Amino acid sequence: MAELGVHQSALQTDLALCVNRYRLFSPGWYVCVLAKVQLSPEESEVPGLVAMVNYGRKKQCEVRDEVFHGAPNFVLDVFYSEDDHDFLRRRDRFCNFGVHEYLVAFDAEPVGLLWHRLDAGCYRLVEPDEDGIIRSHALPNLWLPLKAVQDRDWWAVLGCIERGVSRRANFA
């Protein structure tokens, strides 16, 4: 991953804090920032954040030699624009290797957000439900309120995450 600017890094840190808050309520998950993901023997990436199920039928990858091997369940990256070559390459690569959800934030005012979900081998963009919340399938009960994320209202985001994790998870 290319070196991040200060504003990109701050946004990534805030989003990582939110995903890690979810992890604290959800045993059995690895959540790491800037960890290497070996997608195949020839191809690897270092995303902004990786989340993977650590056991059971939803587990998609292994941790060996301090590296994720295989496609994690969830990846998050921060870029400046949708035209960024690294974003386009990563999106295609993560889709091809089976990353279930790829969340991309764009450092702007308001924050831009593209939530990709794997569906029949292709990514489709996820829209919020009627209540304005995007509900992850890769990370059961991770709820992110779109407007609060766009406005960088991290307290509202954390409150929504806590509401989500208080529900019975659907691991189907």
Model-derived segments and spans:
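Gly/Pro/Ser/Thr-rich low-complexity, intrinsically disordered segments predominantly at protein N-termini
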Residues: 1-172
